[in-house]
């Protein structure tokens, strides 16, 4: 009963709350800083009782910049990202994976069209704090419905660089967060973004993607979630033969991906149901001798809703 009263109080508060111009201005400052500034730093990802530490280095330039992300815990791996190419170096397997995807990662989490976020989030200024030895200003994005998570961002008061990002559930409790523990903003040597390993003799695996229309194969993939619109529809090469179809929906901040893969030739068993990792919820179904996997940084009910909307109709 107490939880219900808190939820009703939150809904009532959001109904009266309004996005403020000051909050939108801070979002624009954060977005500009993550795109235009060069920096290097160490951040910690936390969800539940698990943590991962990474080092990120970015050089901003007229070509769109270059960025290197290094895992400092567990299995060694490096990711080097340019404007349109992502290379993942796996030294233990001597493999380089090449992709053309452009997924946003911390600290560059915000979309270009910030004003559209106010349709689905109440955006307000939060309290000042201190992160990585720097004074930071916070902005809170609380969802106007239960279909998406809340977000709290804290940025360097001077430069606008995002220092901390937290995802919140519908009770305002943390699901996961990214936090810089050390960061240097300013000129960065280009040597800092070069791969650590000489990978000229390594095996290169390209994840080729081509535009696709799933309806032409009989698949109906749609989303009735307010604000989530289709932003990607492609087919990707998978293993030596075969492929997987992918459709991505996004509200500008959160994204949900639908993957459709034939069961023919698949050796590992399919485990239908719901699973999750931090803020990521995953729903797996079998449909028409295919496995449908829906992965999204959204509440389980939202991901389930999109998964149940995937149907196959035999073409005449």
Residue ranges of model-derived segments:
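Positively charged n-region of N-terminal signal peptides that target proteins for export
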Residues: 1-4
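Hydrophobic h-region of N-terminal signal peptides that target proteins for export
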Residues: 8-17
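N-terminal mature ectodomain segment of secretory-pathway/periplasmic proteins
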Residues: 18-94, 119-168
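Acidic/charged, solvent-exposed loop-and-adjacent secondary-structure segments enriched in E/D, K/R, S/T
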Residues: 88-109
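Extended beta-strand-rich segments in extracellular/periplasmic secretory proteins, especially
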Residues: 111-168, 202-247
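Surface-exposed amphipathic alpha-helical segments
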Residues: 159-161, 168, 172-191, 293-316
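Short, gly/Ser/Thr-rich active-site loops of penicillin-recognizing serine hydrolases
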Residues: 186-213, 316
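Short, solvent-exposed recognition patches
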Residues: 201-288, 300-305
């Amino acid at each position: 009963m107490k939880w219900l009263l808190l939820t009703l109080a939150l809904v009532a508060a959001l109904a009266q709350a309004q996005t403020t111009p000051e909050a939108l201005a801070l979002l624009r400052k954060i977005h500009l800083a993550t795109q235009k500034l060069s920096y290097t730093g160490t951040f910690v990802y936390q969800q539940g009782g698990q943590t991962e530490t990474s080092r990120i280095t970015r050089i901003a330039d007229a070509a769109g910049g270059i960025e290197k992300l290094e895992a400092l815990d567990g299995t060694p791996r490096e990711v080097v990202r340019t404007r349109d190419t992502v290379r993942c170096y796996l030294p233990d397997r001597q493999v380089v994976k090449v992709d053309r995807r452009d997924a946003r990662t911390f600290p560059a989490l915000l979309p270009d069209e910030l004003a559209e976020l106010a349709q689905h989030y109440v955006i307000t200024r939060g309290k000042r704090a201190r992160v990585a030895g720097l004074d930071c200003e916070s902005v809170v994005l609380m969802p106007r419905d239960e279909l998406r998570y809340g977000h709290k961002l804290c940025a360097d008061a001077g430069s606008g660089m995002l220092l901390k990002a937290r995802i919140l559930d519908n009770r305002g409790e943390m699901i996961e967060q990214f936090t810089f523990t050390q960061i240097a903003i300013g000129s960065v040597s280009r040597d800092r973004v070069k791969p650590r390993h000489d990978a000229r003799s390594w095996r290169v695996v390209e994840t080729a993607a081509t535009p696709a229309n799933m309806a032409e194969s009989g698949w109906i993939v749609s989303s009735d979630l307010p604000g989530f619109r289709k932003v990607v529809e492609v087919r990707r090469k998978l293993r030596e033969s075969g492929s997987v179809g992918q459709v991505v929906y996004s509200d500008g901040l959160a994204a949900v991906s639908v993957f459709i893969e034939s069961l023919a030739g698949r050796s590992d068993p399919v485990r239908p149901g719901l699973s999750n990792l931090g803020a990521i919820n995953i729903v797996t179904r079998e449909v028409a001798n295919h496995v449908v996997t829906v992965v999204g940084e959204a509440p389980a009910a939202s991901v389930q809703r999109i998964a149940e909307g995937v149907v196959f109709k035999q073409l005449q």
